Design a protein with these regions (language model features):
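Conserved Radical SAM active-site core
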Residues: 1-94, 103-106, 132-139
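Structural preference for beta-strand elements that scaffold enzyme active sites
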Residues: 36-38, 68-70, 93-97, 120-124, ...
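Active-site beta-loop-alpha junctions enriched in small/polar residues
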Residues: 42-44, 74-76, 99-103, 126-128, ...
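A general structural detector for well-ordered alpha-helical segments in enzyme core domains, enriched
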Residues: 53-60, 109-112, 162-166
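Anion (oxyanion) recognition and catalysis
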Residues: 62-65, 117, 164, 171-172
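Histidine/lysine/aspartate-rich catalytic loop segments that bind and position anionic ligands
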Residues: 98-106, 111-144, 149
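Auxiliary Fe-S-binding modules of radical SAM enzymes
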Residues: 129, 135-230
Length: 230
């Protein structure tokens, strides 16, 4: 909807801003009912620079109640001031993922996240740059925890032991856990590996450590799923 495919810090509308409500010549939606729409995955849905456009985004989500919309944010402390008037206890078709990269971020953002009226909540431990303990935040509200390392040539190292620690916390609380991607620099068994971007998801899946991830768990972004907007 907005953001940039080139630079994630640049906030602008993309050509796909209104993709969820675009129609074909026969009047049917181009985005089929039941689709999962990943929203602002190259940016942040709650950027202040995008405030003027967000009303239209909420309206599209409401209009397309036959689709699920999923966005991540590290600005969860802005959500309450950005919600539409008819939000109530949340739109049933909107999933919100709160990102945390270290313990400081987790301890600040997650209490706010848990206090907000959201129907579907996930925690995104990404880019994971240190070992974190989120066990006290793993309430029944949390539908999934997903963990990923950092991508890019200047990416910081992600230690596999940090991933395993998060997994253990989730298992103890019976919260679904997904190891989404390794990141570019991945430390395992005392050795640091450089993993090309195109292999990071596949390498994470090879670890085989996902817990209770299935049809009822929060969806993952894949190359086959069309991004809406930004």
């Amino acid at each position: 909807m907005y953001g940039s495919e080139i630079l994630s810090s640049e906030c602008r509308k993309t050509g796909n801003f209104n993709l969820p409500v675009k129609k074909k010549r026969d009047g049917s939606y181009k985005t089929e009912p039941g689709s999962l729409v990943f929203t602002c995955f190259t940016s942040d849905f709650l950027l202040a620079d995008a405030d003027e456009w967000r009303k239209d985004c909420w309206q599209m989500m409401k209009q397309r109640s036959d689709c699920m919309f999923y966005f991540f944010t590290k600005r969860i402390d802005r959500l309450s001031q950005c919600l539409p008037k008819d939000w109530g206890d949340g739109y049933e078709n909107v999933i919100v993922g709160c990102t945390v990269e270290n313990q400081k971020a987790a301890d600040y953002r997650l209490p706010i996240f848990l206090s907000l009226p959201i129907k579907h909540k996930t925690i995104i431990a990404a880019p994971l740059i240190e070992k974190i303990d989120i066990s006290k935040y793993l309430s029944p509200q949390i539908e999934e925890v997903a963990a990923s390392g950092e991508s890019g040539m200047s990416a910081r190292v992600c230690d596999y032991n940090w991933i395993l620690s998060l997994r253990a916390q989730c298992i103890e609380k019976d919260v679904p856990f997904c190891f989404h991607q390794t990141g570019a620099h991945f430390l395992k068994d005392g050795k640091t590996y450089f993993v090309k971007r195109k292999y990071q998801i596949a390498q994470a899946k090879k670890a085989g450590i996902d817990y209770k991830i299935g049809a009822d768990s929060a969806p993952e972004q894949t190359e086959e799923i069309r991004l809406a907007g930004f």
